[in-house]
Amino acid sequence: MAKVNPRKRAAAAKDKWKLKDWYIVYAPEFFGNVEIGLTPADEPEKVKGRIIETTLRDVTGDFTKGHVKLYFRIHDVKGQNAYTKFKGHKLARSYIRSLVRRRTTRIDGIFNVTTKDGYKLRVMGMVIAIRRIQSSQERAVREVMEDLIRKKAEELTFTEFVLEAVNGKMGAELAREAKKIYPLKRAEIRKIKVLAEPEA
């Protein structure tokens, strides 16, 4: 088998990159339509469907939000601009590890909910109690978590729900309610995944 000259291979790869255009990727309107990255492609259709990962810090400029990861999917391209939809978020593992220490209790809850405007979401809440707690207290905290998340979904639109979850407002409300059962270190909405959008 004839060997391909490494220089020719490198030149061919370089030519492929020359043929690609760079598209500017923007966050959805409810995140301010800010620029969140660049992505290369040789034709616009190949850009659609790509997932862009960024952080809430990069979107808002708030340096305290670097642990909040955001995921957006490109759904439309106009010229050199690529527009996205929110697909989910999660807290960085290192941040979660920093909260969970010895002799604390981590209480998780996973709930499928539908927002006021028909978006189906999988929402994962997390509460950290400052000490080891009894199983009955753990169940009570999880019930509070579920009640609050389901109530929020019924009352809020998709954009309102997502913003309250990622900016910490929903977690703060959860903490206020759950600490009536046992003293807490932290409460967070640690992950959201968009399962389905309402049918047009």
Curated annotation (Swiss-Prot):
Q: What is the lineage of its organism?
A: Archaea, Methanobacteriati, Methanobacteriota, Thermococci, Thermococcales
Cellular compartments per GO CC: ribonucleoprotein complex; ribosome
Which GO MF term does the entry hold, naming one? structural constituent of ribosome
Family (UniProt): Belongs to the eukaryotic ribosomal protein eS1 family.
Which gene carries the instructions for this protein?
Answer: rps3ae
Instruction: Fetch the InterPro entries from UniProt.
Output: Ribosomal_eS1, Ribosomal_eS1_arc, Ribosomal_eS1_CS
Q: Name one Pfam family in it.
A: Ribosomal_S3Ae
Q: Which SMART domains match?
A: Ribosomal_S3Ae
Instruction: List keywords of the entry alphabetically.
Output: Ribonucleoprotein, Ribosomal protein
Example of a GO biological process term: translation
Which species is this record about? Thermococcus sibiricus (strain DSM 12597 / MM 739)
Give the protein's recorded name: Small ribosomal subunit protein eS1
